Amino acid sequence: MPRYDYSSMGFYTYDCLGWPFTEVPPGGGTVFIDELTLAVSGAAGTATIAAAKMGLKTLAVGGVGEDMMGDWVLERLKSFGVDVSAMQRKPGWKTSSSIVLTRADGSRPALHMAGATKDFFVDESMFDHVTDAKVFHVGGVGLTQAMDKGQNAKVMKAAKDRGAITTVDVFAGSPKDLPAIASVLPYTDYFMPSIEEAQALTGLRDHGDTAKYFLDMGVKACVLTLGGDGAYYHDRDGVKFRVPAFDIVVKCTCGCGDAFNAGYAVGLVKDFDPEMRVRFAQATSALNAMGLGSQAGVVNFDHTLNFMKTQKTRG
């Protein structure tokens, strides 16, 4: 029996978010906003807290700096019951941090400082600890520079060798990001990029062709998040379907894909069938979009399940 339900390794960041952002004031001027909040975010960080909120016993695996932001990230993770024993403090590095300017339509331009995420490194002595989970997730391949040089793939192989279900999300903007991502795909059960990232990597537009590209690289299944168009699932056995998005009023899209990953992990732990997993992941993402900041709108498992069952979807 694994020690954890979910181990989430990769990109952890400190976010300061304001809403609604309308303009940059000229010179040294001031524009007043209605809300300001802080959040642990990042492809691994958002997923970690969202999963913990929904009842998974969760291990955080990443790096923060020796600064106030790092202190806050660790305390915030612990406040949700997350095990931070695999979080590293990186001397000489600042914690990866963002100022997120969220518009009224939910779009969120950001100013980001890439910090300790670039330097954290999981060596072989840590493999048994960090992969001791039913679901092992790597979030932010492409942003974890020290790990992207082959170590992510080694940890993924170790996770597969001990029987974990593996999931991967990425940060990608062009085909040049593909080599770092390609190395982990043979050990990936569920590859879950956004459609924008998948298209940037492959140059393809059709959802089926895009998914097949990654299936041919070794993944068991590809789950493409489509924003307001829902999600597309396609696996090696030929099962494929699209799930529509929920009809909601969007407040902030920060962390929506990462919350989707957490919801999908919950579905794996609960042994949901593929379509229910994707629907539950969509519900988690939708709730995330209804709050300001990553995972703010996610409450608990029962709340997400009820939302999935009762909320209308888009046509």
Q: What residue spans do the PLM features occupy?
A:
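Glycine-rich phosphate/adenosyl-contacting loop at the front of the ribokinase-like
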Residues: 1-63, 68-79, 249-251, 315
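Conserved phosphate-binding/catalytic region of the ribokinase-like
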Residues: 1-6, 10, 18, 32, ...
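Alpha-helix C-terminal capping segments
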Residues: 48-57, 102-103, 267-271
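Hydrophobic beta-strand scaffold residues
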Residues: 58, 84, 166-167
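A glycine-rich helix N-cap at a beta->alpha junction
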Residues: 76-92
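Conserved phosphate-binding/catalytic loop of the ribokinase/pfkB sugar-kinase fold
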Residues: 89-90, 100-145
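Conserved beta-alpha-beta core of the PfkB/ribokinase-like small-molecule kinase fold
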Residues: 135-212, 229-230
